[in-house]
Amino acid sequence: MSRKWVEKEGPRWVEKEIITREQYEQIVGLYDDGKHAIGILPLLGSVLLGLGILSFVAANWQDIPQLLRLSMIIVIMTAFYTGGEWFLRKGQDKLGIALTALGLVSFGGGIVLVGQMFHLVAYDITSFTVWGLAGTLLTYMYRSRFLYLISLLIFTVAQWYSTEQFHQYSYAALAIMAIGLGYFTWQRQNTLLTWCFSLSFVLQCMMLIVDKDWAFLWFFIPVMALYTAGDWIKDRSTGYALQTVPLIAAYIFAIVMVLMWDERTSSLDKLLAMPAAYIGGLVLLLAVSVAGKLKQQRGSSAFEWILLAPFVYLSAGIEVLYLLALFFFSFYVLWRGYIEQWRFKINFGTLLFICSTMVAYGKLTWDFMDKSLFFILGGLLLLTLSWFLNRRKKQILADAKGGEH
């Protein structure tokens, strides 16, 4: 939470005698935004310094003798690591982590530059995997979120580079990222790290399906396994962060099925997985997911699985069923938001409902309505829905606050 939020909500706590005025001032004092801003400066400075060094070396690289090049790489990397450790021992954690991060960047840059110096030809991303592994080890050594994010970025970009440049998927990179950084995510229970891990994992699953040219539905098996893991996390903010990206992926897939599915032209071989194996895998994940939800007393959230219903295997009515799934899921998110009095969830559910409505509008009217009229009516519908739902949200939240007095 931020200082601004505490300053806004704190007086109400004092008024209800939940805390005293002195306690309120002490709580506000804990959220000094100035200190957070100053703490970020070394990290930003490390990024700029790293870019400056890389650009300088790249501009003059060809004019530097080979032995001096190798010495520069070793000296710069060692200096950054040594400086980082020194500042960390002095208690200047931000600056120490910033220099350690520069050491990690220097290590990766050194791998590339040494390969160029000695004309080494790479046929896979083993060197990048080693770089990511080094970042993972540093993450555990210093328990740093910044080093975690850099390592996660290295693995994600390396995987993309492998599929794009070498046309092969690196299972080793995925395994090291999923096990190493995944366990760190599980330990820290940090919302930001969990969001980033979930996004990277889903993207890498997409790369796997595309690279192997597998039926697209296989994508949802590892993705929903990630969702299922979120049901066994006690901290709900972390669980939501782990599950939101898989649900967004399923929601987008349902939209695509509504807008673009055509039985006459669609290639089922590119989409449909083997029914027995795929549906069996989903049912198994659903069972484990529901068990976790019941343990956490969140059984009603099993309704989120409606987006994964395998309507695509039916012979007719596929678009209508996926459209209904979109609306039901949107209503569910709205309903849970109102029940929990969670403003973010209400806003998100509102956005999903508006999006579902526009998908239905586009599906039903695009082919036969004049295009200018289509956009005019669509805009009016969007504005009307937005006004109505926002008005309804404010009314319900106001009633909820009134009931607390």
Q: What does each of the following model-derived ranges do?
A:
Residues 1-405:
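Alpha-helical multi-pass membrane segments and their bilayer interfacial helix-loop junctions
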